[in-house]
A protein has these predicted regions:
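A short aromatic-anchored loop/beta-hairpin motif
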Residues: 1-99
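Beta-strand elements within well-structured catalytic alpha/beta cores of enzymes
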Residues: 3-7, 36-41, 128, 148-161
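Short, glycine/serine-rich, charged loops/turns that create anion-binding
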Residues: 11, 44, 132, 160-162
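Short acidic (Asp/Glu) patches
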Residues: 20-25, 70-73, 104-112, 138-141
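Secondary-structure boundary elements
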Residues: 29-34, 91-97, 133-137, 147-156, ...
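Internal, conserved structured core segments that host functional sites
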Residues: 84-138
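Surface-exposed, charge/polar-rich loops and edge strands
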Residues: 124, 133, 140, 144-154, ...
């Protein structure tokens, strides 16, 4: 079974970070090559669950503002994983409708890390939305998608462990992370290692650093 990955993507300039690039490049070299990739990005919240375009001719979604032009000139024309999209729809229960958006392709939470891991854009990719922020519901969604991994489909969750942008006193590169961020990160890593699903689902009440770590949830 191919692993599921959780990647931090940050803003588009993260592709200029040598450490981040080296880590993702190493992962791509060490892991089995996927038959296809299914991405869930924190940048696309849409209910009901929505499946993005499977056509490589659909432009990327440049969902960021105020950056130099060359970040908007990036292309990533990976094949669309139409068969994976069909399996996602088939895996959903009858009382949870699925929508298709033929005009939305990959956003920067999806294509930025993929340009590093699979720069030749030769692995089929499809993106789906986050249909809810409810952890229990998302856990059930993950359980429905899990069988895709048996067929070599890599599931990627893309986002940050914390996202307390309003509370960052110093957002510059190399700044010392705030305590609420480091404490939340350490707690999450510990709970994942212990497979403590109950605690992770109830992170709003149990995790240190809340609500600063995730003020929008």
């Amino acid at each position: 079974m191919i692993p599921a990955l959780y990647l931090s993507h940050g803003a588009p300039p993260l592709v200029d970070d040598d450490l981040w690039v080296s880590q993702l490049t190493a992962w791509a070299g060490e892991l089995p090559r996927p038959t296809a990739i299914l991405v869930v990005s924190a940048h696309w919240e849409s209910a009901p669950l929505t499946i993005g375009s499977t056509s490589p001719r659909t432009p990327l979604t440049y969902d960021f503002w105020g950056f130099p032009q060359h970040y908007y000139d990036v292309t990533y024309d990976a094949p669309g994983a139409a068969d994976v999209a069909a399996r996602v729809e088939a895996a959903m229960p009858a009382d949870e409708p699925v929508r298709h958006d033929p005009h939305r392709r990959l956003d920067h939470g999806a294509y930025v890390p993929l340009t590093v891991m699979y720069p030749d854009a030769d692995v089929p990719v499809v993106q789906i939305s986050m249909p809810t922020l409810d952890p229990q519901h998302l856990l059930r969604l993950g359980e429905r998608l899990r069988p895709l991994r048996d067929d070599g489909v890599m599931l990627i969750g893309s986002g940050f462990t914390t996202h307390g942008l309003p509370f960052l006193d110093d957002p510059s590169p190399g700044a010392v992370p705030p305590t609420w961020s480091t404490e939340f990160d350490a707690w999450a890593a510990e709970r994942f290692a212990a497979a403590d699903v109950d605690a992770l689902i109830d992170f709003r009440h149990r995790a240190p650093g809340m609500p600063y770590a995730h003020p929008t949830i």
